[in-house]
Regions:
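Iron-sulfur cluster-binding cysteine motifs and their immediate structural context
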Residues: 2-9, 14-39, 43, 47-63, ...
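Iron-sulfur-associated redox domains of electron-transfer enzymes in respiratory
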Residues: 60-347
Length: 347
């Protein structure tokens, strides 16, 4: 049976009940004195992997499969989540890309490119929509939570692919459909998303995976001298690089021709109350919610590397954005990002 993105290693479980107490959706049960994940209830937020004192809650490896893809396909691009700027802060862009290319990747592209197209399409969608509450599809944990635990709000999720999937579609359109795309970021739930869209993203790995991979291959990014080709392809992202911080999506949502009330909230503990309380305003306004499961945004994802404060991480993201103006972007109007979300049948 295929492993889910998060699973239990029974031999390591000491029956301490910490994950049972900490799980925000009560998706863990005890069997034979071991704590197992209830797959039908899990939203893959990764909190259990952070609180387990013995490492019994494991994150599924993606590096082994990625190696096979690199060995068998000539063109493989790494889609790098925008929080890289606060996770590898001691490296230049060129050094990080050079290190990734040493692993065998053809090139490195910013997931934020996909985020920018998502923002544009969401803006258009909101302009044409009736008053109501609309929720971003960018965070896969939030999407899973709503589909399982707030099913009546599933129709409120904007019917757009996430930035990761949008980016993969852009890359395949630009370089050809035979291109293979691997994603790297701080989010465990992206592994689930990749499982559901295998035609777009082959594998999702974490920043921890990437760092460990460098170490195993004896690659020291900080010692590398970048070559001329060690830059982001096919172009560098602009405003999309703000996506990993709370509120980072909102600047890209156009509310000029039609008034859109834009708000951002993070932390799962807030999500349910936010949605429920704003229901009372759905007849009056067009309300767009950027909801992120991790406190402070993706910069605080469960598979993050850096333990730096959220304030410093946010600062680093904003500094990176300020240092890199908008690129000239080709017309992407022909790329379809629409999708549908259905509530799970949890009966």
């Amino acid at each position: 049976m295929d492993l889910k993105p998060i699973y239990t290693e029974p031999e390591n479980c000491q029956d301490c009940y910490k994950c049972v107490r900490e799980c925000p959706v009560k998706a863990i049960q005890i069997e034979d004195n071991k704590a197992y994940i209830i797959e039908e209830r899990c939203i893959y937020c990764g909190h259990c992997t952070q609180v387990c004192p013995t490492g019994a809650k494991k994150i599924r490896d993606g590096v082994s499969r990625t190696r096979l893809i690199l060995q068998n396909y000539p063109r493989v691009i790494l889609s790098l989540a925008p929080s890289w700027a606060c996770e590898f802060e001691d490296l230049s862009i060129g050094q990080l890309i050079a290190a990734i290319r040493k692993l065998g990747f053809s090139g490195v592209s910013e997931t934020a490119i996909g985020a920018e197209l998502v923002s544009s399409r969401v803006s258009d969608y909101l302009q044409q929509s009736q008053p109501g509450v609309y929720i971003s599809s960018a965070c896969p944990v939030v999407v899973e939570y709503i589909r399982k635990y707030s099913a009546e709000h599933t129709p409120a999720i904007t019917p757009m692919l996430s930035p990761m999937l949008a980016h993969a579609r852009i890359l395949k359109d630009y370089y050809g459909n035979d291109l293979k795309v691997i994603f790297a970021g701080p989010c465990i739930c992206k592994k689930l998303e990749a499982d559901h869209f295998k035609e777009l993203v082959e594998v999702a790995i974490t920043f921890k995976d990437l760092k460990n991979w460098f170490e195993k291959e004896n690659i020291h990014p900080e010692q590398l001298t970048p070559a001329a080709e060690d830059h982001f392809i096919p172009w560098q992202a602009g405003i999309g690089s703000l996506y990993p911080v709370e509120g980072g999506m909102l600047p890209g949502i156009d509310g000029e021709s039609k008034k859109i009330v834009k708000m951002a909230f993070s932390d799962l503990s807030n999500i349910k109350d936010v949605i429920k309380n704003l229901d009372t305003r759905r007849e009056k306004d067009t309300i767009f919610l950027e909801l992120l499961a991790c406190k402070g945004g993706c910069i605080n994802g469960p598979a993050k590397l850096s333990q730096t404060s959220l304030a410093i991480k946010r600062y680093n993201i904003q500094q990176h954005r300020a240092a890199h103006p908008e690129s000239t972007v080709p017309d992407l109007g022909h790329i379809d990002l629409t999708t549908t979300f259905k509530a799970y049948d949890c009966s």
